[in-house]
Design a protein with these regions (language model features):
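Phosphate-binding site of ATP-dependent enzymes
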Residues: 162-246, 250-261, 289
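A short glycine-rich, hydrophobically flanked beta-strand micro-motif that places a catalytic Asp/Glu
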Residues: 44, 181-185, 192-193, 271-285
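Hydrophobic beta-strand scaffold residues
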Residues: 39, 90-91, 119, 139, ...
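Active-site nucleotide/adenylate-binding loops and adjacent lid/helix of ATP-dependent enzymes
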Residues: 1-8, 26, 56-57, 101-190, ...
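ATP-dependent carboxylate activation and anion-phosphoryl transfer catalytic cores
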Residues: 113, 203, 249-350
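Generic structural signal for residues in well-ordered beta-strands
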Residues: 39-42, 91, 122, 181-183
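ATP-binding N-terminal substructure of ATP-dependent carboxylate-amine bond-forming enzymes
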Residues: 1-90, 97, 103, 127-131, ...
Length: 350
């Protein structure tokens, strides 16, 4: 079966996180080959017409969507599934709406609030001057659109004394955060990642083993956050001292159950498909707070999602097969409407 492995066009600088995306593409393509499929890597560029023509000429049975940004810009991520929808092409992972609502962190937090799912309080630069702002001490300045801890560093946690000072902090940091940012109440405490994998029969998520990120050897004046260094710079203190664990004492069972329940609620609220990851902080009182909902999280071999899959007994190849066959099962025995460019039927076993 011909499978397009779609990924976003890289920016000219090709940052470390973008380079990791290329590792992800190669690894997925190799797994597809091992599953006796014909993978065709395709870069999704801002030249949408060219991308359309290329996809039309390849005529894949399904698209493995690995687009995380386009030309280094996270706010364009929803263009890929939108184009695939317009072409009636089945693709892996979340749909257009879910990609858009989860990639816009402010919108995602508004939806979480509407669903009464706990998420830390936040303000945007646009809120300043329009209403009385609560001042969070401390708070963390985050990007609206960029993921993978882009722009997050040790100075991202701030203690604003006035709304003007908070506005200044956001203004000074917004460029390194992709141009749009917001301030979120910083939750002191533990950090957890919950990975969810669709079960092909009805898209009900399988909850993979819960992971905690442990901050080892951090001094008292260091904020325990998974910043850019902790995620991407392998020689840094932060990277080497943020350790993932799947082992928990018995007294954590009620907390883990609560986190799993909230994670499954997020799956429903955002209408997720395929695979997702929900990031949590847990405060000193044991209350979980949703930081982010990640549709189509990184599935490079060294990623947290793959580590959770391995803990559940799934090999990388098995994981890729599970993700791939979700859209195939949904499109089985279904013919695409004829168009000026192409028409074909999905075959589960070619």
């Amino acid at each position: 079966m011909r499978v397009v492995v779609l990924y976003g066009q890289m920016s000219q600088k090709k940052s470390v996180d973008e380079q990791d995306g290329l590792v992800q593409v190669e690894s997925v393509a190799n797994a597809l080959s091992a599953l006796n499929h014909d993978p065709v890597p395709v870069s999704f560029s801002l030249d949408v017409k060219k991308t359309l023509q290329l996809l039309s000429s390849i005529q894949p049975s399904v698209v493995f969507n690995l687009v995380e940004s386009i030309d280094g810009r996270g706010h364009l991520i929803h263009l890929a599934p939108s184009i695939l929808d317009a072409m009636n092409l089945p693709y892996t992972g979340a749909g257009t709406d879910a990609i858009y609502t989860t990639s816009n962190k402010v919108l995602a937090k508004q939806l979480l609030r509407g669903a009464r799912i706990p998420t830390p309080a936040f303000v945007t630069p646009e809120d300043v001057g329009r209403k009385q702002l609560p001042l969070f001490k401390p708070c963390i300045i985050k990007s609206v659109w960029e993921h993978g801890s882009v722009g997050i560093d040790a100075d991202s946690v701030v203690f604003p004394k006035t709304s003007e000072q908070l506005t200044l902090e956001m203004s000074q940091r917004r460029y390194q955060l992709g141009g749009a940012c917001f301030a979120e109440a910083f939750v002191e405490g533990r950090e957890f990642n919950l990975s969810l994998l669709a079960q092909n029969n009805d898209n009900t998520p399988q909850v993979l083993p819960l992971a905690e990120i442990c901050f080892e050897n951090y001094s008292r004046d260091q904020y325990r956050i998974v910043d850019y260094k902790a995620k991407w710079e392998s020689e840094s203190f932060e990277y080497q001292n943020t350790v993932r664990t799947f082992d928990f004492p018995a007294q954590d069972r009620p907390l883990l159950a609560k986190i799993q329940k909230i994670g499954k609620e997020c799956w429903k609220v955002f209408k997720l498909k395929g695979y997702a990851r929900v990031d949590f902080r847990v405060d000193a009182s044991g209350n979980p707070w949703v930081l982010e909902v990640n549709a189509n999280p990184c599935i490079a071999p060294d990623s947290g999602f793959v580590a959770a899959a391995h803990k559940a007994g799934l090999s990388f190849q098995h994981l890729i097969g599970r993700i791939l066959y979700g859209p195939i099962m949904q499109f089985e025995d279904r013919c695409f409407p004829e168009s000026d460019t192409f028409s074909w039927k999905i075959a589960v076993n070619e």
